[in-house]
Amino acid sequence: MSTRVDYVSVRVPRYDQSGVLKWVEYLYVVIMLAVLTQGPVLKIWEGSGQSGSTILETTKYSTYLLFQLPAVVLLARRGVSQNMLRGPVGVLLGFCTWMLLSTGWATASSYSLVASVSLFITCLAGLYVARSFTLLQQLTLFLVAMQPGLVVSWYAVRNNWSGAVNFDENYWIGIYFNRNSFAPPAALGFLAAGALAWILIVRRPRFWAPLTVVLTDVMLLDLGLLIRSNSSTSIGAIGLFIFVWAFWTLVRQVQRKKLISARQMLQTVYPLFLFVMILLTWIGFKFQKYLFSFFNNKLDFSGRTMLWRFSWDGFLDKPILGWGWFSAWNTPNFFHEREFWWAISNTTWSHSAIMDVLLGGGVVGAGLLVLAILWSGARQLERVQTQNAGQWTFAATWFVLAASTQESFIVGNHFMWLLLVAAMSGSRDDKVRKV
């Protein structure tokens, strides 16, 4: 008598570890970007009762560094292509290296070292975002990361938190340092939501209509918060973003009709774009008084003109090498040799990233940054045609640059510097020809 044994094969569901890790990485990037808006960090640590102390500054710096280190490690593991390093990304890293080297001749070397290291770290974090995520993913991450601080700020205003509203001029600050710290997250959230809505309308995937409605609601929320901040800096930067987006959208339509070749894009259209941007900048500064009167004098530089004059005079003192990154404003002689120095002796920056770059790195540092910006634009011309929202690269770059004329946004530990680096460096789905 024989015994028959039947074996039943049971398939155990596989645990998709890679998928889970990807979502963990998404969560990490959202948290990192939210931290680099600086509002949450300022609110948490300044509530510790150590406001104004050296311990508080060290704690805040350590917090920013801690949340960016995983990005640097992941970038090191994934690497950067030789094509990127031999192009504008290499020049951008050269700019950060120059500012780091400026510590050697800085007039306030200890401060310059900390500032230049943080500049480099945040640049690497921006490269990590560009290297690791597609344009669609980047836009989604930027959008989601901006919302927590904005929602908490809205809650803070509604519940009368201390410092959430400037009652003298009735503008909102929320959990941020000031209105020009509160407005950029609202502006980026608004722009990222708009770019995502653009992609949905163009692609029309499943559920595109309800998703577009949700994005529209987010845009209205962020725009409302931006308006309540009364920040003319971010509103003006958004205006330039829209102009740049419209310019490249028009070019995109003309190019699709085969009226413009790739060579013409590089040799004619791109120089024309740069000329228009320079012309608009010149008009803005030349006729600023008329613009102010048009806006009923609600736009003003809040005393920044004097800061810029000090910065320009300081640049002329050391035009080639500069004073060292963020070193000038921490040098006593920088004030005492100039008229009205006592009025701004407590200031530690120029209220203009353009002036900060000239002061910190001189002509060499400024030249490296300008070269990186121009070269990145030339390399990314193909995106205008190949990506559904390829206009984002140029529009986001000039959005940050426009805002940086009024605030020190080219600085370490700030999401605007990370955004600029990511926009200039591209995205994971790029297939950009070598220029």
Which role fits each region the language model picked out?
Residues 31-33, 213-220, 348, 352, ...:
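Loop-to-helix entry and N-terminal half of a specific, functionally important transmembrane alpha helix
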Residues 68-80, 97-154, 402:
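Transmembrane alpha-helical segments and their membrane-water interfaces
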Residues 223, 231, 312, 319, ...:
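A conserved mid-to-late transmembrane alpha helix and its immediate loop/hinge
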